Amino acid sequence: MGIDERATSLPPGAMRGAIVGTVALITVFAAASAPIPLYATWQQQLGLSASDVSMTIVMYLFGVLSVLFFAGSLSDASGRRPTVGAALACGVAGCLLFIGLSSGPMLQFARFVQGVSCALSMSATSAFVIDCASERHRTFGMTIASTGYLIGLTVGSLGIG
């Protein structure tokens, strides 16, 4: 399908999908960066060692990399919307784990879940935003797809104060 055909074949609510995808992308990454400034507090409250905190970072990276390596094209097979939904569900689950945080392993698992959420969002939500953007707003879609996660990381880190 050519660019001209794509511009006329988008459903009427496609731009709304691009906006929803943008909000989802920024939200997932804001939620993932919000816990980082709290590591020192949790280290003191939970009695974590420096290596426990380091392992928390490793678990996040393991979550991201495992999804990108083994399920990076998941949204191509199952569709963008279900994969974006899974990314949001993992993001919510990660946040809920932080609410009841009581141990180092729980902190590490919460960060792993957030890593999975971010990886799913990186691939599927970015593609969803681009797919939904009309030709007139294609630059917007591509800009959000490439910078939305950075905006989310900034918002989350600043938001936690």
Where in this protein do the model-derived segments appear?
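Pair of pore-lining "gating" transmembrane helices in MFS-fold secondary transporters
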Residues: 11-44
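Central cavity-lining transmembrane alpha-helices of secondary-active solute carriers
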Residues: 55-72, 122
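Small-residue-rich segments within alpha-helical transmembrane domains of MFS-like 12-TM solute carriers
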Residues: 29, 33, 99, 115-123, ...
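Small-residue (Gly/Pro/Ala) motifs that create kinks and tight helix-helix packing interfaces
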Residues: 39, 152-161
